Design a protein with these regions (language model features):
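A short acidic-to-branched-hydrophobic micro-motif
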Residues: 96-122
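A short, sequence-level motif marking secondary-structure junctions
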Residues: 82-85, 108-113, 170-173
């Protein structure tokens, strides 16, 4: 369990690796062009973000799940049986078990001046690059409860006990704060296929207040 949490914390850190360069590149591109297409439009809109669509198996899991709330943030998910509470703080939320997987959510509060749209576009571009390199098997814009973000699923790890993740990153304005939301569902690579429907059902059940 500690190994999975350590790897997940590392992934949060790696999310920001090279992000400064991506921000500069996207910012430069935006300043030099007055036109846009599907790869460069502002991430504040929702037109280019898909909405979750559950399979039959995922719907069954979600229908039988129990809602769990993150009191300090107002966010909630529906969790199946076997996903106990581990640790919940103001900016972190951890539920799960080695048998089924882990839900690891974190909040990062950004300055009001932080370019959230540009940052999210850079995250998307970086994820597409990982997709090209075979490190991710799925990348898309995904709207969760009215919040646009980037969703990706990692490719199988080289070893069976390596960590594999289903992840989503987005931004919201909440109680006067500009917040980055980082949601990770993870388990060992050999268990991922068995849990992937549960991971999707959990992620897509997310309710995100904006105020």
């Amino acid at each position: 369990m500690k190994s999975i949490l350590s790897f997940s914390v590392l992934m949060v850190a790696l999310t920001f690796c090279g992000i400064g360069e991506r921000l500069r590149q996207v910012g430069s591109s935006n300043s030099n062009s007055s036109t846009s297409n599907s790869s460069t439009k502002s991430t504040s809109g929702e037109s280019d973000a898909e909405k979750p669509s559950l399979t039959g198996a995922q719907q069954v899991i979600q229908d039988s799940a129990t809602e769990v709330k993150w009191p300090d943030q107002g966010i909630s998910w529906k969790l199946p049986a076997g996903w106990p509470k581990m640790d919940v703080k103001k900016e972190s939320f951890n539920y799960g078990s080695p048998a089924n997987g882990f839900l690891i959510a974190s909040i990062s509060t950004m300055p009001d001046s932080f370019p959230s749209d540009i940052s999210l576009k850079a995250t998307y571009d970086q994820a597409l690059e990982q997709l090209k390199q075979g490190k991710y098997e799925k990348v898309r814009w995904l709207d969760l409860d009215g919040v646009k973000g980037v969703e990706w699923v990692e490719a199988p790890p080289e070893t069976k006990d390596g960590i594999r993740r289903h992840q989503w990153i987005g931004f919201r304005n909440y109680q006067g704060q500009n917040q980055q939301l980082n949601i990770i569902l993870s388990t060992d690579g050999e268990k991922f296929n068995k849990q992937e429907d549960a991971f999707a059902a959990i992620l897509y059940s997310m309710k995100i207040p904006k105020a």
